[in-house]
Amino acid sequence: RTDRMGRDERNDLLARIRGQTVLMPNMRPIFEKYIGELNPNYQALIPVVNRKLESLEPNQKRLAKLKKADFALFASNWWPHADFDQLRIVTYLAIWLFLWDDVLDEPTGEYADNFEAAQLYRKETVQFLADTLGLSISKEISTVVTYSFSDHVKVLARQLKSSLEYVLALHPSENDYMKRGGFVAGLKTLGKQLESAVRWGLRLRPTKKSPPTASHPIIEGFRVIGEELKTAYTVEQRQNFFEDLKFYISTTEMEQRFHLDGKLPTLKEYWEVRMGTSAVAACLAMIEFTNKIKGPYQSTNHPLLKTLSDEANIIVVIANDMLSLKKEIVQGCLDSLIPLSVPVYGGVQQAIDQAHTDLLAAVDRFDAEAEKLLSGPNTTGLSDRELRIFVNGCRDCWVGNFNWSLCTGRYGLGVIDQKSGSFHLPL
């Protein structure tokens, strides 16, 4: 009965929205006061992205749709200062986040209507992320196995001592072997043992085999990202990134429950979920990577930086949910900001106007927080230069997301006249 009531509520709301034409307010002044640059590697990245998509999506119709979204443009807007190699990896991350989520929440998604299968998909993903990032999961807490430098020195010393004793026939048990094998054989053995000792001391000893191929190609697609970050990031940075990804994955569970139960979430419930499903935090955690910053940093989860990260997240979500409204209504998706605001504010236009007001307020809060961070004492652990890069990187992301949203074929706004800033949008 509850399920039927929820579906009736959804159908009524969809009928209330469809067929209307609304005025999307001019958001350009909010974003254009900041320079929205485009990464100069954009054109070179397009064929790389197309090859990546072709390797992940066998369905030609869906492949064409994905190419139309222009992920190269997305990444080039979000990370305008990244070198090509770094830009390629963050673009792969953007693709991975979009595709991983589509399996669960698109109407045609593989596990959209199968919660049990979706849970297995989530569980395997979390484990695969940890493995590829060089982290191990234990009792829901991620740790990494490391050895101190002194441990390596002790092991190296023991192996060198053993090797020298062996070749010089100082070890009683090995005298007979030396006599039988001769001095050359002893030298060969010494060489092998020295190689082993040095490899251990330099942490070049054989490592565990990389995680086996994931059961789903989308999950497997994260491997190249994780392997890159194992070199580029410290344990702390990888842990921070992993926490943001885990939050993203966990909130998709709540989102799917709403969908399957037929229940429309309240605005409060929506925001609790959307702060994770937006995946903005995980993208902001790559600012250090795109700027080649390596250190024991938390960035997006640091108590002093989380407010800034959260405001950037809110800005991206509001602007995204406004500009993707047409796409969502065409697909019959109501779990986004504007549709859920309609019953609260009395209509679609009123919901859009309120979102615009909230967007302006979020930008003001972001600017105030950025000013506070950059003008006050720096106790974030980042250097002053690194802190400024992170703050500016957060701004690049929400400015870039707006510019991409107006151009991407994913939202279907390209054919609409946007020159005046505001535009009419038929739903």
Model-derived features: where do they sit?
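Alpha-helical, largely C-terminal catalytic domains
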Residues: R1-L427
